[in-house]
Amino acid sequence: MPVCNNDSQLIGLGVSVTLADDTTVNGTVYTYNSSEGLLVLFQGFSGSNPNVKIIRTPFIKEVTALRDNEEKLPPQLEAKARLPSMQAARDRSLFKHASSQLRNAKDKRNQLLQTDDQKTPIAALDTLIKLERIYPDIHWDKDAGVIRFNQDVVVKGKPDWTSPAVVIAEGAGDISRSLMERVQKTLSKK
């Protein structure tokens, strides 16, 4: 492909391109980028869709300019022409994304609250939901009847779940102590 002073000089020119395998492709140059090594040919419309060929310039053997090319580029937009709004598609995409996020949150909440034990107090589940918003990796340990953060830190109802308290295992490290303090602050907020 010859290098032009300006890549835009070729745009709109009718050409016949012979490829390295001796196949011929005709069309109007839609765009040419010598630095990227790309030539895009416009070949008219099939139905309402444009027919475009993208060719890598290393595979071009020969380019011949055509005098009266029947295929021309579509006309440019007028200065005051307005493109169709993309807002409808954007709204649909946002709605789809929001619906997906909501469905995932509901599934996660259902999984979090799934317990076969009918004796689980409602106040314990309320505390679990409150803490799960901040600490998403916690879970309900139905065998011990506690909310478990890790092996060292749990939340128990003392004496019942209307006043939950954070309990730390003996010999726990500084990280667990720090977590205990943060959880206690979270529980003290209403």
UniProtKB/Swiss-Prot annotation:
The record's annotation in Gene3D superfamilies points to:
2.30.30.100
What does the record give under GO molecular function? Answer: RNA binding
Matching entries from InterPro entries are given as: AD, Lsm12-like, Sm
Offer one example of a GO biological process linked to this entry.
mRNA stabilization
Q: Does the keyword Aminoacyl-tRNA synthetase apply?
A: no
Residue limits of the AD domain? 84-190
Which family does the similarity line name? Belongs to the LSM12 family.
Summarize the subunit comment: Forms a complex composed of at least MKT1, PBP1, XAC1 and LSM12. Forms a complex composed of at least MKT1L, PBP1, XAC1 and LSM12. Within the complex, interacts with PBP1; the interaction is direct.
Q: What is this protein called?
A: PBP1-interacting protein LSM12
Organism of origin is: Trypanosoma brucei brucei (strain 927/4 GUTat10.1)
